[in-house]
């Protein structure tokens, strides 16, 4: 179904069954599969393949040579009906690949709203990217990776399967992540290790009072020699006075130390 006021270049192929909403713009030499939905105001520049069960929201801009919704690279995948969901107002630059999910995950690879995925970023099956994230050039996400809101991933970095990068965290360029990066943290290296709090990002997003509370939480987690469980007890007390700390506490509570997929946190 192609609605009115929609532009589709005559060299592009839109399969029967695809839904292209009003105001969408599909440039030359694109392929849109039969189970794809493209929201209003979304622009596809040129030479883009969108396939599988893929839903793309409103006002996204997708640049040339991107591949979205194709079969993932998990060898266990046998053609199950899994999907990709992309929200609104994302900027997806050249040669980005976003693969469909697997039944072993949640069945969906998800990108939220207002994200920037720079050139040659790879988003593997079952990844979850929140809102307002930046993934710089040639970022590589393994399967089941989570990138939480306002996180920044430096260029040429890779994140191991099942790792989580917390909100407002930053990973420096050319890093390799094999453990979870908690919220508010700056990490760097191969393997990525703790540098300190993400001071530049925190000052940009938070008031002075909240910034100081986050620094206090950082001290409790990293600088007082506490076990993770003891640190969580102290963080819970701090969160009663400063709700911004709940973001860190919830992240740590999501980590199942007894799971065979637990990666631990960067130190």
UniProtKB/Swiss-Prot annotation:
Assigned EC number: 2.3.1.129
Recorded superkingdom: Bacteria
Reaction equations catalysed: a (3R)-hydroxyacyl-[ACP] + UDP-N-acetyl-alpha-D-glucosamine = a UDP-3-O-[(3R)-3-hydroxyacyl]-N-acetyl-alpha-D-glucosamine + holo-[ACP]
UniProtKB keywords: Acyltransferase, Cytoplasm, Lipid A biosynthesis, Lipid biosynthesis, Lipid metabolism, Repeat, Transferase
InterPro entries per the UniProt record, alphabetical: Acetyltransf_C (IPR029098), Acetyltransf_C_sf (IPR037157), Lipid_A_LpxA (IPR010137), Trimer_LpxA-like_sf (IPR011004)
Pfam short name (any one): Acetyltransf_11
Subcellular location: Cytoplasm
Range of residues in the leader sequence: none
Entry keyword Cytoplasm: yes
GO biological process, one term: lipid A biosynthetic process
Enzyme category, top tier: transferase
Family statement drawn from the similarity comment of this UniProt entry: Belongs to the transferase hexapeptide repeat family. LpxA subfamily.
Protein known as: Acyl-[acyl-carrier-protein]--UDP-N-acetylglucosamine O-acyltransferase
Organism: Hamiltonella defensa subsp. Acyrthosiphon pisum (strain 5AT)
């Amino acid at each position: 179904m192609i609605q009115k006021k929609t532009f589709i270049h005559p060299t592009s192929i839109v399969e029967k069954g695809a839904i292209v909403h009003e105001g969408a713009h599909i440039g030359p030499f694109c392929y849109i599969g039969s189970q794809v939905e493209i929201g209003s105001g979304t622009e596809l520049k040129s030479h883009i393949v969108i396939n599988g069960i893929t839903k793309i929201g409103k006002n996204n801009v997708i640049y040339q040579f991107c591949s979205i919704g194709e079969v993932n690279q998990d060898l266990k995948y046998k053609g199950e009906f899994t999907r990709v969901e992309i929200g609104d107002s994302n900027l997806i630059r050249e040669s980005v690949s976003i693969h469909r999910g697997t039944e072993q995950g949640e069945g969906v690879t998800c990108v939220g709203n207002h994200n920037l995925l720079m050139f040659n970023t790879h988003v593997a099956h079952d990844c979850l990217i929140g809102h307002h994230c930046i993934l710089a050039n040639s970022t590589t996400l393994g399967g089941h990776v989570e990138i939480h809101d306002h996180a920044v991933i430096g260029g040429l970095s890779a994140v191991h399967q099942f790792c989580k990068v917390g909100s407002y965290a930053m990973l420096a360029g050319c890093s390799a992540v094999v453990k979870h990066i908690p919220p508010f943290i700056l990490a760097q290296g191969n393997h990525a290790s703790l540098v300190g709090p993400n001071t530049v990002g925190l000052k940009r997003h938070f008031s002075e009072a909240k910034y100081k509370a986050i620094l206090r939480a950082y001290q409790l987690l990293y600088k007082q020699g506490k076990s993770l469980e003891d640190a969580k007890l102290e963080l819970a007390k701090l969160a009663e006075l400063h709700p911004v700390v709940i973001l860190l506490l919830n992240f740590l509570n999501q980590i199942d130390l007894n799971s065979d997929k637990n990666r631990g946190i960067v130190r």
